[in-house]
Amino acid sequence: TVGEGRCNLSLGTSGTLFISSGKFGVDAHNALHSFDHADGGYHLMGCMLSAASCNKWWMDEILKTTEYAREQEKIKNLGENRVFFLPYLMGERSPHNDPDARAMFLGMSMDTTREDMTQAVLEGVAFGLRDSLEVARSLGIRIERSKICGGGAKSPLWKKILAAVLNLKLDLIESEEGPGYGGAILAAVGCGEYESVQAACEKLVHVVDTVEPEPVLVEKYEARYQEF
């Protein structure tokens, strides 16, 4: 992911937003990390410590099931869940920088279902990623779409939620192993196969599917995010 305002979302154990930028971006609270690339340009990074690992904890340790897809198939009313999940199982890095932050469910009632809580976990991670995205936007960085990779990207439902919460088009790339693939691309540039990282990415990174944010869900999730 190279080029002004381009973004990559890695939805693995942790959740990381990598945002390409032509300028060094630091906010007043150091909420995001900013790095200088060897051949020019910068990237901002927002990293939440627990992302897909929140879902793994919920499914494996609490529900005691490995049927991830089956559990998610039961979720129907997106954007209407009254339960919130704060995804801070290991403290939090970006943008809060608080090792003492802790996870919790909020808003449960006698009507709360298993599906509501599963949905809340997926949404809570999406809201946590939105926190970092909002910091980048406050720095004047305009982002309209992002590539997505990592184990969590295998879930169609989660991608749909993320697209709506972030209000971004999400491009799924051909290779699921984003970090390894990126390392190979950098090696190809270093060996002289391509004149720049951007040229290599344009040639080697192939989008196989795009999830568009649905306007109705964007509106519903905007209200939910403001509550979060």
Predicted regions, residues:
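Active-site core segments that coordinate phosphate-bearing ligands/cofactors
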Residues: 1-227
